[in-house]
């Protein structure tokens, strides 16, 4: 377990500044009924957990990440106690809510398979810089911006290309449809074989194929 909360002073005039960073090993059950006062980026290093926000539950697995704006109630917890490790940072800045929204982070964002070596590398640079009481604040400010931009790029790339999990999920479903289109195929069957809920399957399928699963099936016939 390692965390740092820098003493906030002159860095408050910067557009981005670090208000806290750490590695939770293990991560515990956290309930924030009123959210945080800072912006938050949080990724899973190992183990598994769940995030609950806005009435929905999101799986937190290695490579997954979420962004949370200030003031949003949320909860997260490990699936197995003492076996979940996360890397988190919280940051602030004047007009940051508008800036984050302009970059596509509107309140809450989540995705799987977005954490890459660049993101983890910058995170550990920030963790090191945050320990420097003399020059760490400005260095961290630059790294926070670089970190956000790399996270944004990873989120956009995952959305564009679907992420490996979405690709493999659709590949299984499409192969099944092509082999069995002559018989009755249900949405429940496609979702079950893909290992996801009907709602998630439909959303990913429509995002990638630009049509609903049953519409695609009808066209194959």
Role assignments for model-derived ranges:
Residues 1-65, 80, 103-110:
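Generic protein-terminus/edge-of-domain signal
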Residues 151, 176-178, 183-221:
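Basic/polar phosphate-binding segments, predominantly the helix-turn-helix DNA-binding elements
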Residues 11, 25-28, 48, 70, ...:
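A general structural signal marking secondary-structure boundaries and capping sites
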Residues 115-118, 165-173, 209, 218-221:
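N-terminal positioning helix adjacent to the helix-turn-helix/winged-helix DNA-binding module
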Residues 98-164, 175:
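Amphipathic alpha-helical segments enriched in hydrophobic/aromatic residues interleaved with Lys/Arg
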């Amino acid at each position: 377990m390692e965390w740092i909360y820098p003493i906030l002073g002159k860095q408050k005039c910067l557009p981005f500044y670090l208000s806290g960073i750490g590695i939770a090993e293990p991560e515990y059950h956290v309930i924030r009924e009123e959210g945080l006062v800072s912006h938050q980026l949080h990724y899973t290093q190992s183990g598994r957990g769940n995030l609950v926000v806005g009435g929905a539950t999101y799986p937190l697995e290695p490579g997954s990440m979420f962004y949370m704006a200030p003031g949003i109630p949320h909860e997260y917890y490990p699936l197995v106690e003492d076996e979940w490790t996360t890397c988190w940072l919280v940051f602030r800045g004047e007009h940051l809510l508008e800036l984050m929204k302009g970059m596509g982070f509107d309140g809450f964002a989540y995705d799987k398979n977005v954490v890459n070596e660049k993101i983890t590398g910058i995170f550990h640079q920030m963790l090191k810089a945050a320990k420097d009481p003399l020059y760490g604040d400005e260095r961290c400010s630059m790294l926070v911006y670089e970190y956000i931009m790399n996270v944004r790029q990873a989120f956009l790339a995952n959305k564009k290309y679907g992420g490996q999990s979405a690709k493999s999920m659709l590949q299984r479903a499409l192969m099944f449809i092509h082999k069995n289109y002559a018989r009755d195929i249900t949405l429940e069957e496609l979702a079950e074989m893909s290992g996801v809920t009907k709602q998630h399957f439909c959303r990913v399928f429509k995002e990638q194929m630009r049509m609903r699963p049953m519409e695609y099936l009808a066209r194959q016939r």
